Structure formats: C-alpha cells, structure tokens
Amino acid sequence: MDEADFSEHTTYKQEDLPYDGDLSQIKIGNDYSFTSKKDGLEVLNQIIFIADDPQEKAMHSETCGNTAVTIPLGKITENAANKKDEKEKQCTAALHIPANEGDASKSSISDILLHHLSKEPFLRGQGIDCETLPEISNADSFEEEAIIKSIISCYNKNSWPKEQTPELTDQLNPKRDGENSNKPGSATTTEENTSDLEGPVAAGDSSHQENVNVLTKTKGPGDKQKSYQGQSPQKQQTEKANSGNTFKYGQGQVHYQLPDFSKIAPKVKIPKNKIINKPLAIAKQASFSSKSRDKPTLVQDSLETTPESNCVEKQHQEQKGKITEPSQQIQMEPIVHIHQELLTGIESEASLSKLSPTSQKGTSSSSSYIFQKISQGKQMCQKLKEQTDQLKTKVQEFSKRIKQDSPYHLQDKKLVLEKLQGHLELLEQNFLATKDKHLTLQQQVHKHESTIVGDFDPERKVEGEIFKLEMLLEDVKEKMDESKYTSAPSLPVSSPVTLDDLASTFSSLSNEIPKEHPGHPSGPRGSGGSEVTGTPQGGPQEAPNEELCELAPQTYLNGHYGDAAAQNKPDQVAMRLSSNSGEDPNGTPRRQDCAEMTAPSPSCAFCRRLLEWKQNVEKKGHGRINCGRFSIVLHEKAPHSDSTPNSDTGHSFCSDSGTEMQSNKCQDCGTKIPTSRRACRKEPTKEFHYRYNTPGQNYSNHSKRGAFVQPHSLDESKNSSPSFLKPKRICSQRVNSKSFKGEHEPTPGKKKLQAFMTYSSDPATPSPHFYSCRISGSKSLCDFDSTEEIKSEILNSALDHALRTATILKETTDQMIKTIAEDLAKAQRWRNRLKY
C-alpha cells in the first residue's frame, strides 16, 4: 500500500462530544495503559511478527486504542493508585493538578479510557493557548520545558507495549467504523484534553527499562527504515509541544474535578510603551524552543522505533498547520494591533505636524510682520541714540575749549554755540517725529490683531540723553557768559582810603573847574572851596582826573557817610563793582553817541572832558581809577554788541540846592543837562557790591535790590557841625545795588532800582567837600539800553525754553499714560487667551 492510502487508513476522525456527553463514547487511540510487564512483552512479540505487514501496521494504531477494554478492573484500580502516587512525586513542582484518579474504580471503563490519553492528542493538541495567552517568565518556560521533556520521554517509553494489541482489532473495528463515519469533528475535542498526560506517564515507569531493551533488540531493518521517515514529523510535533507557553491546564474540568482556568481573566499584558520588547520576547521564546530540539538520545531512539510515526505524519503536519496558525495569530495579533496603534499615533503626529504649519502659517506671517515692526522701532531708536551721542561729544569738546581757549574769541564761540543749539533743536524734532512714526506703526500692528508690539525707547534712554544734552548746552552758555563778563583782567582791590584823601583828590579836580559855566548860575561860595554849578570841570589832563572820568560810563560811586566820626576817622572802603559795557574785552572802540557827532569846542569843559575820556578808553580798554589810596576795580562784561546807541545824553547830573528841576544846555555842543536827582530812565544790568570796612562796624550789605539811599547832607547827621547846614554841592548819582553775600548773581527779569547818595561839604571845615562830578552819561546810557535789551532777550528765551520744556514733558507724560494703558490692555488680552 502506498503512503497516501496508508495515511488515509491511519487518519481517523472522532466524534465532537460535549464535555458532559455520553460516557459510552470512546476516545480512539487515546489509552495505552498496561500495568504488567508480561502484557507489554506479549504485545511486543506480536508486533514484531506483524511488523512486515504494512496493512497490519496500518491497523495496529486503530486497535491499540481499545486494548484497555480487556484489562481487568482490578488492575486498572491498582494502576490508578500507582499513578496517583508517582504523579504526586513527579509533577507537584510545576503541574498543579489534583489527581482524582482514585475514584476511577467507581466509574465505567469508558470514563477511565477517556481519563488516560495517549501521546497522539498530546502531540497534536494545542492546549489552552487558543483561549488565553498567559504571560510567563523565562524561568517558568525553562521549568516547563524540562518537565515536558521528562513527560515525553516517559510517555514514549511506556507507550510501546501498549501499541501492539492486534487481537483486539476485530472487537472494536465495527464500532470505530461507525464512529469514523458519524463523528468527523472529534479531533478538536481530543485536542482540547491535553491536561490528561500524566496518567500514562506515571503508569509506565515500572516497565520502562525492559521495554527499552526489548525495543532495541527487536528492531528490524524495515521498522528502522520507516521510523526514520517519521522522525522529522515527530520532532516537529515535539517542538510544538515544547515551544513556549502552549501547555496550561484547565480544560479537563468536565471529566476531572480540576479548577477551570478558562474562566479566569487572561493575564496577557502588552504595554504600549514597550512595543520593541515584545518581538524580542518572541525571539527569546523561539530560541528556547530551538533548544528543546536537543532531545535526549533515549527519546530520539524511542521516536525512531515508533511504528505509528508514518501513520500520523501527514495528520500531524495538518494538525501543526492548524495549531500554529491560531497561536501565531494570537501572538501576532496584539503586536500587529500595537503596531497599528503606533502607526496611527505616528500618522496622527504627522498630521498634527502638517496641520500645525498650515494653522500657524498666518500666525508666523503676522509674527514676522510684528518682528519687522519691532526691529524697525529698534533701528529708529538706535539712529536717534547715535545722533544724540555724536552731538553730545561735540558739546563736550566745545565745553572743554571754552575752559582752555582765551576769552577773546567769544564771537566764534557764540556762533558754534548757536550751531549746536540748532542741532539740538533738530534732534528734538526728529525724536518727536520718530516717536509719532512709531506710534503709527504700532497702530498698524494692532490692526493686524497682534498683541506683541515693540516699544520705542522703552527705558527712555534716548529721551534722557537728549535732555542731558540740552542741560549741557545751557551750562556751556552760562560759562560763555561768565567768561565774557570776566574777560577784563582783574586788578587788586584798593587799599583803605580816607575822606581827606578823597577831599584832596576832588579839590584838585575843583581847581580845574571854571568859576562859572555858561548857562549855569553860580551859588554862594565858602572859603577854601568853590561851588560847582553843574558839570565837572577840569583843566589840565591829570592822571587822577582822567581816571576818575573813566569811571563815569561804567560805574557810579555810592557811599554813605552819615557819622561825624567817620569824617575824623579814616574809612576803609573796599568796593567791587561790576558793570555792563558795550565794549568788547579786546579793547574795541565803543559805540558812538550823539556827543561824538557834535564837535565840542574847548570852551565847553564837559564836551572836552568827554572827548578826552573816549580817547583814553579806546587806548586802554579797561578802567582802573586811582584816587589817592581809593582804588576801584572795574570788571567789564560785554553781553552783546548789536545794541543801538542811545541819543540821549546827560543822564547823570549835578544840581544846586535851590535849583533841582532845572536843565541847561552847553552852548557849544548843545548837551542838555537836567538837574533832576532821579533822572536815569534806564536800568543798569550789571551789579556791584561793596563793603564798609569801618572800625567797629561789620560788613553791611544791601538787603534789597531796590534799596534807596535817600539824598541827605552831612548836616542831617547827629554829630554834624553848624557849618554843614549849608550844602555846597549835591551830587545825585544812579547806582545799581544788589544784595550779595560774598558773590554776585544776576537775576534777569527783575528791575533794578536806583540809589542816590548826596555829599555835602562846608568850605569852612576841614571835612572833605564832595563835588558833583558830572560825567557824561551818553556812553553809559547806550550800554544800559543794550544791556536792557539783552536782558529782555535772555528772559524771553528762558521763558520760551521753559514753555517748550513744559510742553515736551506734557507730551511725554501723555505718551507714557497711553503706553501704559496699551500695555495693560495687552496684558488683559493675554490673560483672557490663556484662560480660554
């Protein structure tokens, strides 16, 4: 018979029975249980004789399943008891299945046969893996593999004597034929009962050694040859039985009272985060199963001599295909599912990454627009900062030059200062324009629904630098003014003088004055002195007289001599005067007045004296008056040279005691000489302060700028002599007095008042006679007019600057308030966005 027919005869089907079905159904080819060595030897001898017959070899597997029917019941009971003891010794470590075979004596023979399974369902059974995939460790797999190897070896050894019972073939063939025709689906039932292996394994231990010896002796060449054909399928079956996690016990519950593990929830745990570890575990299991291929030589020999290996070769190949497919599906489905989840997660991430650029495309464009605006704001601020730094450097250099250079280049410095101020104004205008431009850009950014807007000059550094630069220019201007005022060289302050010295000086001056000036009435005269009618007159050009005349356009003497003791004691007076003049420090000629236009005749002493004074001033360029020991140091300061000359002259007068409000003219030059004590219409701009160094008297300063020293005579004082009752000459002069304590400080915008001092002398007494020194006021009045205009201009410019600064501060404050409000609105919008 060919191999195909042989496989058809040997491939049989079993009835698909429920677990609580009829106990009369017989599991075909499942039980080969023999308890005596004698029976095993007899059956072995029988199979040796029929080994050459292929038909008998094909049928022996069918008949061997029912050999247990002829076994007496007592032997079966003993067999069950022995199996229980040996099973508890061998399988308590790994196979926790209670042995209830002790009750087999009370059951039927078919129940016992169902209880003891052969190796065939063991080899082709797929176990509990179809339902659950238990999670086992590598140590458990090693233990189970060792146990399964021992079970297979023992089972194969004990199964050889059970396979040769040809005499029972006739008894069971009719029933098996019916079963084969009516029960095609019983294979799956036998495959599920894989937990009943231990019975035959334990029962065959007693006959193990002799059965092996007999098999090794009685093997024929035909048997050996055919057993070689079934060796690889048996190895495949054993590999399947030994690989991995295929043997868990829990479905024999119907026939044995075993715990139902199928009702327990599966313990398969496949963490999603450890997807890579699962294939590695499978690979390890495969490697472990590959180790199981190295079977003991005893098992290999027993498999070589298995006569039914050819019978079940194709069947087990088919069974293997059926078994491996579900197990592979069970093992691979979770992995595939996990990989699918991984792939879907990756796809979702990829989709998110694709969506995020598209969704953020508008945002990125708007953000780039915002950054562009921010960068523009920073660039504008940086440009302004650079311009401010450059201008600041120039101003600092110019300030150093003012300190180092000579004071005779004021005009050039003034031009440079004006240029710097113009640059500063342009810079301020540029700053404001840039700020407005940045505000416009901010509004454009807000229209694009953006909340991130760059700030222009956030810390207000540029604005602060511009303000500092403006203050620096103001300081430079003040320094220039100070250098202009102090450009004339200062000489030592005079030594103390006495009234006698002053009297001698003025007496020498009075000797030069003519007895009577045309147009001026003459008054009474005392002995030793002459009454001067109106104008200071002098003859020869003496140095004290000239220097006294030089004093006229720059300063007016102011003295207070009220005590008679002061007349007897020398008064130490140190006077420091400061006056404005239109003359530059380098000695440039002063402005011309109406007195220059009229050529004075020698007969007019006033005109002659005025002309001489002008010539001397042009030569010297500075004024120093020496009247004996009385020295007056003049500090000339020329604020501006663009003032127009005043045509009025003669604002400093002398008058008689009886004719105070009279005015006269010079016949030659037509100079008008009014006699008013307060005839000055202009105010001096410069100041001087003086100290009284009288013994027993502290320094006294005028406490008010508008202080007036009322005109009085020496006879009004307490210790005045009767000769003082008749004043000889009253000289009214205008002075500019301010209150200073050690230093003089100009205060523009406030009008200076006039102070008058009158001096009287009696020619009968040795006290000094103060003659009115009428000095030309034309030049001084021109200087006063120009100084007044300069002061008004300075005041106006200061007020304009203050108003401009206040306006800038107001605009800055408004801008700051607006910026703060915008920032608060931005912060509120951001908070709302973060909340939602």
From Swiss-Prot:
InterPro entries: AKNA_Centrosome-Trans_reg, AKNA_dom. Residues 159-172, 181-192, 227-248 have a biased composition (Polar residues). Residues 372-484 form a coiled coil. Keywords: Coiled coil. The keyword Oxidoreductase does not apply. Residues 159-248, 303-325, 510-545, 575-596 are annotated as: Disordered. Disulfide bonds: none annotated. Belongs to the AKNA family. This is Protein AKNAD1. It comes from Homo sapiens (Human). The lineage of its organism: Eukaryota, Metazoa, Chordata, Craniata, Vertebrata. The gene is AKNAD1.
